[in-house]
Curated annotation (Swiss-Prot):
Disulfide bonds: none annotated. This is Aspartate carbamoyltransferase regulatory chain. Coiled coil: none annotated. Belongs to the PyrI family. Pfam families: PyrI, PyrI_C. Involved in allosteric regulation of aspartate carbamoyltransferase.
Length: 157
């Protein structure tokens, strides 16, 4: 008997697929989805995947993600795909792409960096230097952020 995963289709919204296993809750937190006031959200974790071995999937009804939200997701789930659903059909499907530059989303770990000075109005800016493993560098002081640092900052863990 073939086993199937049954999750209700959404009429309009976003499906985030190919999230690395165990990171779906972080994606929800990143998007500010608590489940208390939001529409229908389906969360499936540790689903078998040919590409990843295991993966997570998030379905969000009634919401299309902004570019900034997709950029944030790419930093914690670089293998994810974003499917926009309209009238029960996939209107568009694309893989997330790591942004080459990130401004105002991450903070520098160097306490002496100008971006951490309370009297300076300087937004932290980072440049992508490696996709695998994920590493970014502060444009002001040269401090490196590793994938673990980025995930921790974006998910508040």
């Amino acid at each position: 008997m073939k086993e199937e995963l049954v999750v209700r289709r959404i009429s309009d919204g976003t499906v985030i697929d190919h999230i690395p296993a165990g990171r779906a809750l972080r994606v929800l937190k990143l998007l500010g989805i608590t489940g208390e006031r939001d529409g229908v959200v389906a969360l499936v974790m540790n689903v078998p995947s040919k590409k990843l071995g295991k993966k997570d999937i998030v379905k969000i009804e009634g919401r299309e993600l902004s570019k900034e939200e997709v950029d944030k997701i790419s930093l914690i789930a670089p293998s994810a795909t974003i499917n926009i659903i309209r009238n029960f059909e996939v209107a568009s499907k694309r893989r997330v792409e790591l942004p080459r530059r990130v401004v105002g989303i991450l903070r520098c770990l160097n306490p002496n960096c100008v971006t951490n000075a309370p009297r300076e109005a300087v937004e932290p800016s980072f440049t992508l230097i490696s996709e695998s493993p994920l590493r970014m560098v502060c444009e002001y002081c040269g401090e490196y952020l590793r994938e673990e640092d980025i995930i921790e900052q974006l998910s508040g863990v």
